[in-house]
């Protein structure tokens, strides 16, 4: 067995349990990572997520909406910016060339690849067909290009290149780097860019949006999940810089809908992203949702006592590029026939408040 194979087998994944929605609320039921891990190595006990062993397939990264799992994306952001970013599997030996040797390339989500394209101008994935054919991980790299197009980022998809032949890869390296293909020059460039930290890049790009949203909604409340970032906020930023986009294009992003509500405020109080708001004024109550603030963690569905919140389709590029508060439910004030208290509900024939309904 070659050294590159041993390195690939180690493939450790960094786990940030404090970011998990299960750590935030005992009512949360999200278990996407557990369901998708092919080895059954991910456990969630007492709200704490842990990984026993890891083969580096990266499926947990694709599944998690809260960036609990992390492998090579921060390292990719730190690569030198004097040329395109080239990423290959660790089973290949490009140690003397400016290539990022990573764990399985399927760890990189379409959104991460779009961010890398924005940063480097072009991203090349060397998915050698021979190596991938013998690998236990079932991955379709062109699928990431298709997802970019479905999210209205066709210009980014064009700058994401997939190379499957070794000869084509060698030719590409020679054409784009020439005399950079030496360890000495490569290491010199790496040290020159060491200050370009991934954490600083991503946080700075988000700080303006977070401040703006805090000023308009619950400015007195601090955002609970400052430990991580909303992936939809990053998509919003990409749309702002996208050269061409169709505002009416439907995207494969979940839209929150409501079938019935009694405006108890459980979802509003517990949403870690402050993406849900209930406003009462002049005898009316409105339940609203912000598509960009929302991280699609599903906690609101878990805690709704009426089971009235659901995921649906129908979001467009415009919903994320030009976000606004989308009304999910409205109701007029009414007086409980039993106790006389004012209450709200979307059930037209309901004459009792929730307390009297449950008590009597």
Positions of PLM-derived features:
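ABC transporter nucleotide-binding domain
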Residues: 52, 73-84
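Short, structured interface segments
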Residues: 57-76, 303-318
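Non-ligating segments of multi-cofactor redox enzymes
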Residues: 1-31, 82-284, 292-293, 299-302, ...
């Amino acid at each position: 067995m070659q050294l590159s194979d041993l390195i690939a087998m180690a493939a450790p994944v960094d786990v940030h349990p404090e970011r998990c929605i299960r750590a935030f609320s005992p009512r949360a039921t999200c278990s996407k990572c557990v369901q998708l891990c092919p080895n059954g190595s991910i456990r969630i006990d007492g709200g704490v997520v842990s990984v026993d062993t890891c083969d580096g397939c990266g499926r947990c990264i694709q599944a998690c909406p809260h960036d609990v799992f992390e492998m090579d994306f921060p390292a990719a952001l730190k690569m030198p910016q004097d040329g395109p970013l080239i990423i290959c599997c660790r089973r290949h030996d490009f140690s003397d060339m400016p290539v990022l040797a990573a764990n399985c390339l399927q760890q990189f989500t379409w959104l991460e690849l779009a961010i890398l394209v924005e940063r480097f101008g072009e991203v090349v994935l060397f998915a050698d067909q021979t190596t991938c054919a013998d690998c236990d991980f079932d991955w379709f790299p062109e699928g990431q290009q298709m997802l970019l197009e479905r999210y209205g980022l066709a210009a980014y998809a064009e700058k994401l290149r997939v190379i499957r032949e070794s000869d084509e890869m060698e030719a590409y390296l020679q054409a784009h780097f020439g005399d950079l293909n030496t360890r000495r020059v490569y290491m010199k460039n790496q040290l020159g860019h060491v200050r370009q930290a991934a954490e600083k890049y991503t946080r700075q790009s988000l700080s303006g949006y977070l401040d703006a949203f805090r000023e308009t909604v619950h400015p007195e409340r601090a955002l609970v999940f400052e430990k991580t970032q909303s992936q939809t906020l990053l998509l919003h930023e990409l749309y702002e810089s996208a050269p061409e986009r169709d505002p009416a294009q439907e995207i494969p992003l979940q839209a929150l809908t409501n079938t019935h509500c009694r405006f108890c405020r459980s979802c509003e109080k517990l949403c870690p992203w402050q993406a849900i708001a209930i406003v009462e004024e002049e005898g009316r109550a409105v339940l609203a949702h912000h598509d960009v603030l929302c991280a699609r963690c599903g906690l609101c569905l878990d805690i709704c006592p009426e089971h009235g919140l659901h995921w649906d389709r129908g979001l467009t590029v415009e919903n994320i590029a030009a976000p606004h508060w989308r009304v999910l439910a409205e109701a007029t004030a009414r007086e409980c026939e039993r106790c006389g208290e004012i209450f709200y509900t979307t059930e037209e024939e309901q004459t009792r408040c929730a307390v009297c309904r449950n008590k009597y």
